[in-house]
Swiss-Prot record:
Main location: host cell
Organism: Faba bean necrotic yellows virus (isolate Syrian SV292-88) (FBNYV)
Keyword field contains Hydrolase: no
Comp. bias (Polar residues): 98-114
Lipid bilayer topology: Single-pass membrane protein
The family this protein is said to belong to: Belongs to the nanovirus movement protein family.
TM stretches of this protein: 27-47
Key words, A-Z: Host cell membrane, Host membrane, Membrane, Transmembrane, Transmembrane helix, Transport, Viral movement protein
Lineage of source species: Viruses, Monodnaviria, Shotokuvirae, Cressdnaviricota, Arfiviricetes
Protein name: Putative movement protein
Annotated region described as Disordered, given as residue ranges: 79-114
A biological process term (GO) from this entry: transport of virus in host, cell to cell
Compartment(s) where it occurs, according to its Swiss-Prot or TrEMBL record: Host cell membrane
Function summary: May transport viral genome to neighboring plant cells directly through plasmosdesmata, without any budding. The movement protein allows efficient cell to cell propagation, by bypassing the host cell wall barrier.
Amino acid sequence: MADTGYYAGYQDDVDVDEHKRHQALYLIGIILLVTVCLIVLWVCIMLACYVPGFLKKTLEAWLNSSSLMKRRVASTLTRTPFEATGPERERNWDARRQSTTVNPASQPNTGSVF
């Protein structure tokens, strides 16, 4: 072996098999891919456990909240005036329902089907 100026324990890259390098890179890639998949799976499981609890707390807070806030949200969602969403509307429901069932012929028929 010719003296190249390096110490005797040094091996040149020419001696290393190219196939072994590719195997090492594939192994590192597979390990990283499995690690990322496990992390994504863990995050999905944590979200699946967190979301129902969040919804439960939100709905419980909603049920315990003031009726004023419920009326505001209802008026926003249904696009009815805020004044028409109060308890008077609930009290008048029976009267309105009876007036439509007594005289259904007075309702105009548009001929459309849902």
